[in-house]
């Protein structure tokens, strides 16, 4: 993926995720924002979820209470996929967010 295309696609993905997360009542009171391409969410227990784009690797990186994960874009599946497990970014976030807020989250 070309650098400009990656940057734009990654930024749009982060903005879309923030918008979708904001729609859930269970997440509404949590501190969430995007600053300089880094999406940060802090759970009530102090745990954090951080998503940011890594230009050099053309990936979105996730740091969460589960540990780190790296996601590359698969155009054929139109999804960001974990480079080790193949799990989608959305499925990973559903699990991490559900565990963090104690309610089922489906982005």
Swiss-Prot record:
GO terms for molecular function: 2 iron, 2 sulfur cluster binding; ferric iron binding; ferrous iron binding; ferroxidase activity; iron chaperone activity. GO terms for cellular component: cytoplasm. It comes from the Bacteria. The keyword Transmembrane does not apply. Keywords: Iron, Metal-binding. Belongs to the frataxin family. Involved in iron-sulfur (Fe-S) cluster assembly. May act as a regulator of Fe-S biogenesis. NCBIfam families: FeS_CyaY. This is Iron-sulfur cluster assembly protein CyaY.
